[in-house]
Amino acid sequence: MSTEMLGLILAGGKGTRLGKLTSDQAKPAVPFGGRYRIIDFTLSNCANSGVKNIGIITQYQPLLLNEHIGNGVSWGLDGLNASATILQPYTDNSGSKWFEGTAHAIYQNIDYIDSKDPEYVLILSGDHIYKMDYESMLEEHIKNGASLTVAVIDVPMKEASRFGIMNTDVSGRITEFEEKPEHPKSNHASMGIYIFNWKRLREVLTTGFTTNDDMVDFGKNVIPYYLKSDERVFAYHFSGYWKDVGTIDSLWAANMEFLDGSDGLNLYDRSWRIYSKNPIDPAQVITENAEVNNSMIVDGCYVDGTINHSILSTDVDVQRGSEITDSVIMPGVKIGKDVVIKHAIVGENAQIGDGAVVEGNKDNIKVIGNSERIGVLPNED
């Protein structure tokens, strides 16, 4: 059956700047906002936009991510005319190898894409926090008679040199692409979201480059090729909330923004829900000794200490006398008695022993890795 627009989520990133938090899982699988994982936002955008057939391209440490996505039922992607397909690197008679970049990952999955027979392909990153209607982007793509549409967001001019910058004419047609320019001409930053006409992209990927080494990334290789070939390439301007949470500081800050409800993402919007695979946990327990101020305590938590301006994800235990401030505690963490945690991110299933101090500051967030053990734990003294 033909699919008008097929979604392809690039979810194989290692996320090296997140350090300990991605030592055993891909960046899109990192928890966010108490009950979500980063990839939930892209998957939910697809579901809410009516993009019901999605390929998720994974590579680095995919086990947890694959288990989280499953057959896509949590996002309504398991119906008769819907699907969520995990796509991993494989070897065939041509000697295929690891995905070397964004464009190469799509090239290696041409057979899957052809099986869906799409008119358009929507290529997405699985590691950003945002809400976006891809249907509106497709409508503009068709209206412009575009061969490629690139989603862009305006960033402060002083930060533009950190991004791939799209320079456009008055009609919104992209005339020039600059990868992290020293002296940017505009502030239209690429979001790494693309809509391509599939037949043309397929032709470019299979015949447009001399070797696979010339066809690694969309930003470095494919977009410049389209512009050089005078293809109709347009910018789609997005003005909503969008965060790249690829560093410890940005991940911590985005969680705090969500908690404050200032310019952060509204996760309580019933017209555009963010879905996730959530276990069925008992209600949280907050004892009479506990004190909670401006914090989020998710299902399955036990709190017998003081929580200030922090997020406690599912199944977190905080024993008596402990104090947590300005911190993000990820799922399954066990915190003993009289512990102090400030300006920190504590990774999944970590254990913090009695009396331990985990303290950073706004300019230097302290990180405890997944399953890391700190201090003296019960039965170890």
Swiss-Prot record:
Q: Which InterPro entries match?
A: ADP-Glc_PPase, ADP_Glu_pyroP_CS, GlgC_bac, GlmU/GlgC-like_hexapep, NTP_transferase_dom, Nucleotide-diphossugar_trans, Trimer_LpxA-like_sf
Q: Where does alpha-D-glucose 1-phosphate bind?
A: 164, 179-180, 190
Q: In which pathway does it act?
A: Glycan biosynthesis; glycogen biosynthesis
Any one Gene Ontology BP term: glycogen biosynthetic process
Record EC number: 2.7.7.27
Query: What reaction gets catalysed by this protein?
Result: alpha-D-glucose 1-phosphate + ATP + H(+) = ADP-alpha-D-glucose + diphosphate
- Could you tell me what this protein does? Involved in the biosynthesis of ADP-glucose, a building block required for the elongation reactions to produce glycogen. Catalyzes the reaction between ATP and alpha-D-glucose 1-phosphate (G1P) to produce pyrophosphate and ADP-Glc.
Question: Belongs to which family?
Answer: Belongs to the bacterial/plant glucose-1-phosphate adenylyltransferase family.
Tell me the protein's name. Glucose-1-phosphate adenylyltransferase
